[in-house]
């Protein structure tokens, strides 16, 4: 009887031993694979996004656009990125100057969206040859851009109805690995329309971005970044809705100051908006439906420019900022 019990027990012991070996192998190697993914792909990419406030000099002649195009290109925050997303590069001469100044560091560049169909692999959306303004977004890269498309939003709000605003999509190859980047600029609240309408238009535009991603059929093991001036203030109800609309998550950490548009510290805003509260409007997200690094952080860089001056109506104005927005950098623990 005892012999029979021992024989019956042997398969159970063997089964438990085999399970233990499998468990150890699986989770031991999973940990190794997880570390490799973070260290090599996709966890080795750094992006900076900056709204550079290069409005048309025909409308705003006194904001030092040409001079700031030189200062921005020389700024420390522009160095050592994999990719830079530019917003509000509207003025044709100033944006050309900025892009040319950046070309040595970032030889691979898109045109400014909405200015022309030339230089793009594909143009989608509501592009108009009669728009009074382009979309102001461009992407520059250290690494080869193997695909670039521009998409013009179906609907704009307020003054944006006169422009070709939308987003730039690029596929970049870094060391043989693909990285997908969408740079965009959704509309700010506008006195010509209600805040509810502005919010609804931003939501529609974010849905257009997700529709574009779905149609691209990008492999699930490749990473997608979405960045730019989204004009959604941190911590609001709209901020939380944005995660679902774009299918993104909040960065693990927000480092630096908690404002990208701040009249209390920015010399270009103090006179125009002396009573306005600071806002956090610019972000760089990782899309949830595809590859993700182990951690992703956003940091606002409250960096100051060398002093520059302009004259208007016989008065000299001096500033010490690159733009009315501060740049944001997105990075992993490996950067």
Swiss-Prot record:
Signal sequence annotation: 1-28
- Consequence of gene disruption: A knockout mutant was shown to be weakly hemolytic on sheep blood agar, does not produce the external halo of incomplete hemolysis characteristic of L.ivanovii and does not give the typical shovel-shaped cooperative hemolytic 'CAMP-like' reaction that happens with Rhodococcus equi. Is also much less virulent for mice infected intravenously.
Q: Where in the cell is it found?
A: Secreted
Tell me the enzyme class.
hydrolase
Secreted as UniProt keyword: yes
| Gene Ontology molecular functions | sphingomyelin phosphodiesterase activity
TM stretches of this protein: none
Instruction: Supply one GO CC term from the record.
Output: extracellular region
Q: Which SUPFAM superfamilies match?
A: DNase I-like
Q: Which reaction does it catalyse?
A: a sphingomyelin + H2O = phosphocholine + an N-acylsphing-4-enine + H(+)
Record keywords, A-Z: Cytolysis, Hemolysis, Hydrolase, Secreted, Signal, Virulence
InterPro entries in the record, alphabetically? Endo/exonu/phosph_ase_sf (IPR036691), Endo/exonuclease/phosphatase (IPR005135), Sph/SMPD2-like (IPR038772), Sphingomyelinase/PLipase_C (IPR017766)
One biological process term from GO is: killing of cells of another organism
EC id: 3.1.4.12
Kindly give any further remark recorded in the entry. Answer: Complementation with SmcL of a mutant lacking the membrane-damaging determinants hly, PlcA and PlcB (thus unable to grow intracellularly) was sufficient to promote bacterial intracellular proliferation.
User: Record's PANTHER family?
Assistant: SPHINGOMYELINASE C 1 (PTHR16320:SF23), SPHINGOMYELINASE FAMILY MEMBER (PTHR16320)
Family according to the record: Belongs to the neutral sphingomyelinase family.
Q: What does this protein do?
A: Virulence factor that promotes intracellular proliferation by mediating the disruption of the phagocytic vacuole and the release of bacteria into the host cell cytosol. May act in concert with the phospholipases PlcA and PlcB and the hemolysin hly to mediate efficient escape from the vacuole.
Its recorded name reads: Sphingomyelinase C
Q: Which gene encodes it?
A: smcL
